[in-house]
């Protein structure tokens, strides 16, 4: 397994095991298979586990699989979707969420604690779901005035090694956070050949994921690439029911030419998509959404094969799938 430096967190594996598939939030999976996949990931050289309370059973499975005794060098992340509560509640909610996550995983600290909310500037109106934005998005005043100092306190207390933001919010707000006087230590940024956040995108402005990753790298942050297969849109088939107008389903249809290209090469599209993401500039580690050992083995083999050939990257880019 190749490694990279994840900002101030130091050396990590190029692949991170994400918690969504392990936690049983998409596709079919059993508890036994999830536990076996966790162990197989570390055996395969993965050194980062990316968890969150929103990933259903993920944190509990990590606790059960390792009993609080992770192998040396393995790093764990977790998250909290804060939204925009009253300012006086921000620190308490972050602390309570972290405490619950640590108890579930049987750990005393995590290496990285993410704000799992979208981020928006004060007064911003989302194109989709604006009436409910306080549930899924943190406004700038709360972020700057409450989240940043609360994260600093948790870091000073030793309960977290570092903190970060999930860079799926409004790009203007995310980029401001990356340039703020007190910056996060890491960001999770969209990293796929379509530059698409899919159903995560609730705003109308361009997503600008490569710009976000570049800004983070330039400012010394670690960058974790997420949605390498765009929620299944870049695989041979989506593993869960989706409505016809779901953006992930729309992306799957748009990616028909990509699957045809992979068929010409005799390659699995999911493996090609992961190898493309691994070759993207400014991405330190790619977070996998696998849910079983077979999918994990494919990704491990893809990482071992290395990046795509320049001609392959050019052929993919020539399909014109990347969002503007």
Regions found by a protein language model. Give the residues of each.
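Alpha-helix-loop-beta-strand connector modules within alpha/beta enzyme cores
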Residues: 63-78, 143-153, 157
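N-terminal binding-site loop/beta-alpha segment at the start of enzyme catalytic domains
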Residues: 1-75, 95, 108, 192
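N-terminal small/glycine-rich loop or linker at the start of catalytic domains
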Residues: 8-25, 77-84, 114-117, 121-127
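CE4/NodB-like, metal-dependent polysaccharide N-deacetylase domain
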Residues: 93-116, 153-157, 188
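Acidic-and-aromatic substrate-binding clefts and catalytic sites of carbohydrate-active enzymes
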Residues: 26-29, 52-61, 83-91, 120-121, ...
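Beta/alpha (TIM)-barrel catalytic core signal, keyed to glycine-rich beta->alpha loops juxtaposed to Asp/Glu
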Residues: 118-323
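Conserved, mostly hydrophobic/aromatic
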Residues: 17, 34, 49, 62, ...
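Short, acidic/polar
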Residues: 28-41, 89-104, 169-178, 273
């Amino acid at each position: 397994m190749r490694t990279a430096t994840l900002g101030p967190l130091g050396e990590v594996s190029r692949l991170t095991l994400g918690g969504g598939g392990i936690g049983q939030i998409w596709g079919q999976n059993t508890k036994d298979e999830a536990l076996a996949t966790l162990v197989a990931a570390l055996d395969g050289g993965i050194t980062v586990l990316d968890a969150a309370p929103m990933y259903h059973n993920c944190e509990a499975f990590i606790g059960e699989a390792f009993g609080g005794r992770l192998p040396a060098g393995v790093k764990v992340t977790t998250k909290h979707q804060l939204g925009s509560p009253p300012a006086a509640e921000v620190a308490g909610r972050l602390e309570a969420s972290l405490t619950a996550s640590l108890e579930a995983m049987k750990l005393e600290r995590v290496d990285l604690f993410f704000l799992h909310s979208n981020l928006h500037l004060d007064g911003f109106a989302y194109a989709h779901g604006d009436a409910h934005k306080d549930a899924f998005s943190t406004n700038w005043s709360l972020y700057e005035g409450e989240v940043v100092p609360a994260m600093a306190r948790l870091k000073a207390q030793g309960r977290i090694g570092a903190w970060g933001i999930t860079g799926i919010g409004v790009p203007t707000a995310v980029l401001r956070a990356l340039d703020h006087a007190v910056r996060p230590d890491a960001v999770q940024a969209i990293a796929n050949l379509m530059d698409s956040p899919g159903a995560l995108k609730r705003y109308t402005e361009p997503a600008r994921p490569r710009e976000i990753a570049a800004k983070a790298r330039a400012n010394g942050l670690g960058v974790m690439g997420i949605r390498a297969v765009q929620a299944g849109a870049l695989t041979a088939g989506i593993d869960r029911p989706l409505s016809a107008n779901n953006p992930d389903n729309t992306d799957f249809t748009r990616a028909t030419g990509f699957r045809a290209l992979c068929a010409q090469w005799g390659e699995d599209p999911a493996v090609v998509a992961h190898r493309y993401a691994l070759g993207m500039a400014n991405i330190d580690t790619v977070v996998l959404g696998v849910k079983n050992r077979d999918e994990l083995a494919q990704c491990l083999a893809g990482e071992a094969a290395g990046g795509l050939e320049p001609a392959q990257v050019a052929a993919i880019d020539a399909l014109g799938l990347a969002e503007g």
